Design a protein with these regions (language model features):
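Residue-level recognition of single "structural anchor" positions
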Residues: 1-229
Length: 229
């Protein structure tokens, strides 16, 4: 229970090394405990759960060539290259929740079904100019773009600043606390950061109670909304 509390309540999470010292076990055992705890952060999605003004965006998690020795640098790994990075896609409701997924790529055929699965029709969707978003159903959604390449980041209500702030917290948690996370286990860490974002307005005791409820059964987003309202 002590391990659960520290993982849930620490702003940037807890590394396996830190956890091993807190509970008095080996780092290997602490790492296993950490994965089991992270499993309890995922929320089940059965139907669209976000509505209103929605920001969608993708980011890339992975090592940076500038931090590597010359012999270890990955060739052509800049920008949206997936050679050395793992893409993560997110949908975020302003003044609401975020839903984020580790994805295989950032093509329209991958991202659009995730949007349709999480966002209610008639919502306004804000995105950057990434080509995958061109296929968003304009009959069901009001799709508005922000053209970052032209130096535009906020035009009236149009922006993706909120979800970019979420990405910043996610990357700080990974690089600052865990230093490195494999593709295989990345979704658990994404779920962990999403849980913190979605319960940020709760007190420590309220947040921990939501976590405990999710250890007994996998909560749906509709249930999480009722609990955190």
């Amino acid at each position: 229970m002590l391990a659960c509390y520290f993982v849930v309540e620490m702003k940037r999470g807890v590394s396996s090394l830190q956890l091993s010292k807190i509970v008095g076990v080996t780092q290997k055992t602490a790492w296993f405990m950490l994965q089991r705890i992270h499993n309890c952060f995922s929320i089940e999605i059965k139907e669209p759960c976000l509505k209103g003004e929605i920001e969608v965006d993708e980011t890339y998690i992975g090592g940076k060539n500038k931090n590597r020795h010359s012999k270890d640098k990955v060739k052509d790994a800049q920008g949206r290259s997936l050679k050395d990075k793992t893409p993560v896609f997110g949908t975020l409701q302003r003044e609401g929740f975020v839903v984020a997924y580790v994805v295989t790529d950032t093509k329209g055929k991958t991202l659009l079904p995730l949007i349709y699965n999480t966002v209610h029709p008639n919502s306004t969707i804000y995105s950057d100019e990434w080509y995958a978003y061109n296929g968003i159903d304009k009959e069901k959604f009001d799709h508005q773009k922000v053209y970052h390449k032209k130096g535009a980041y906020v035009i009236g209500r149009r922006s993706t600043n909120t979800i970019e702030g979420y990405w910043s917290h996610l990357k700080k948690m990974i690089s600052g606390t865990h230093f490195w996370v494999s593709r295989k286990h990345l979704q658990r860490y994404v779920d962990c950061e999403s849980f913190r974002y979605n319960t940020k307005h709760l007190s420590e005791s309220e947040r921990f109670d939501v976590f405990l409820q999710n250890t007994k059964r996998r909560l749906r987003y509709s249930q999480l909304k009722k609990i955190t309202a």
